[in-house]
């Protein structure tokens, strides 16, 4: 008999049993949770965390409430034991007084053979899984004289220190957007597997690699070559000599069989059986990211057989046919001739096509993964699709995402840039640590390789772009040493492991790099990074940019010019409704102790519970930004004033992201040939100030609505140099063919009256924008305009054009609206727009009308206990204009009564006392 488990959480393969196997899901057993910190036991669950079981038992309040991240520190600082008994033939980590094994990596899959222990067990078996205190363990490792010590000021501690010594979710120890619960417990399922004595196997993991013949990870695949399928199964048990393998591909929609054949070149190495076949003469329908084509998927069944065609293993996975390639090659002569600046590329190509990556960074959606459900993630990914995003960067260090999350991405066409779990720190490079990492890398690369949504493997977060420069600045005499350690871990160890287990995915050693100079897989350091070997006037790599000086937030000259933007942003407050989920009514004001201490920007840097100095800096950044650009809320009711301030911080955040995204998208037609914008960050882990566009629970901030608008296929954008007064209008398109149309320019005062002679600008301007490109359609200077009062003026830009979507012969009409004001919003001579809101019970849509003036930042809001999003929000509405808006309900706990609580406001409301 065999007991299969993954990491300290005891996760195991969930492949069904065959040929007399008996697989027992330990999630169905009765568990108890105990600790010296308690004087009694409570019911436990698997999977679970100690916090969740203590909450369910009524021992603690909601960990997310108030300052419970501080109040409940006794939980992560204690040891916990999960126990189950009265199960015959059960094999524990500690069983019948016998030690079975210890695990030290949350990210690995473990299996333990306990047959001999079972044979000698003369009592009722008890399975006991002990979880030590993660903060205490890493501190003990740090104090060991044999542990590495890094120069002062290098390692980034957010709350609990020394996280880099443990292969556990790094944000469990705290981050600048989340709490430090450091939870303990069996966070994934576990199983008991009993195999017959005859030759038999149980599948642990499956690697399905689908690529073009001759494809190599860092080189562009030849799209004319046939597809190759490499199927590899990891197992426990024993295979007979000379096993056979076969595959079958079946269309998930039609059920039509694409191909069914035996695989040749079957080899058995250790506990893996592998076969490779070329799909000659087979033309599958391709899988495309969102907006570029259909998400065609196939079920692939791999069967392993022995003598007399006896089935030994049978695995079915859902997959798709696509190539995805990160192009970091040098700029070619042909590109130079097109006006692209010299240097190196840094963009993605899918099925041989360049495309613009539009998206954000996803962080852990909860501090406690066992309560993250497929339905919850489906709602989040539906919001990603609704937000016109085709790529998410899966930030490290959270976890390697569950397969069901990749499944959701496969279905929706969301590319997942994935990373190994290292972030903002230097890590050990001793042999034991590297061996542990090697097993982690191999398991996870093989596990998710069949998903067409998988876009990239990156070595870690900001290691090359932040950590190495920090060493160079603070400990220059040790810079060479730590560059060597960086290359030892991320290039000499991880890169070959990736290449050995997939040919379909590119690897980059860090999330942000200047790219590579050379790749030689036979060299001790197989990838030579560029580092400082750059040439002025040339562009390389991707950018990671933050600037919390809000005085330059709308100055595009401070934005980095690069080939791809993988991180940028600014924090804001969540809405009142979200705060009310976690904060008592008396704490609902901007500078309350609870609100301030839930803000972890800037982090405490230790286990301090009085981080008022650092958090006040982050709160101050939001406050100053609002004061610089927007009407300052001053409502008589304290809760209403708090809500207005929260909303104001979201307005600034959204406008700043809009400015930066427009700049990056315009770069697609500039010398830098910029082809990607992934802002920080998609969603929240809890209710607190952060960079998120979607709050904990699913409510959209202003940011997600605005990014959805500016991520449309064809957009018109104003670029204003407020120092010189220059105003340029650009049209940007991410279509694969040219598009043409016109942009209407309409100058109005804020009462909605057209300005005489349209303020000296033409009423409309034609455009013809190239494929994946941008074009300037108009240029002027504010001084040349005939504006009676710049504070009482708005330019409304309305685009209408035609073009073809990628992989479509149908001509499509595209529209987009934008606006420009000659002064910042706080200086505008606002008027009451006289907003009216109605609801049509038949069409289930809302109608908003402005009766008396221009409505800026028109904002529809909905009450608590419902989750969803409006078709449009944060828009400009002109007098007499009616806009019909639908609402997508994702979750409703009000029995439809939420409709009665929908409200509408505009920037004008931010100036009112009530």
Swiss-Prot record:
Pathway: Glycan metabolism; N-glycan degradation. GO terms for biological process: glycoprotein catabolic process; polysaccharide catabolic process. GO terms for cellular component: extracellular region. It catalyses: Hydrolysis of terminal, non-reducing beta-D-mannose residues in beta-D-mannosides. Glycans are attached at residues 39, 79, 230, 265, 299, 309, 330, 591, 614, 641, 721, 744, 773, 784, 909. Transmembrane segments: none annotated. Its main location: secreted. The active site is at 462 (proton donor). It is found in: Secreted. One of its GO terms (molecular function) is beta-mannosidase activity. It comes from the Eukaryota. Homodimer. Keywords: Carbohydrate metabolism, Glycoprotein, Glycosidase, Hydrolase, Polysaccharide degradation, Secreted, Signal. Residues 1-20 form the signal peptide. Exoglycosidase that cleaves the single beta-linked mannose residue from the non-reducing end of beta-mannosidic oligosaccharides of various complexity and length. Involved in the degradation of polymeric mannan and galactomannan. This is Beta-mannosidase A. Belongs to the glycosyl hydrolase 2 family. Beta-mannosidase A subfamily. The keyword Hydrolase applies. Its EC number is 3.2.1.25. The gene is mndA.
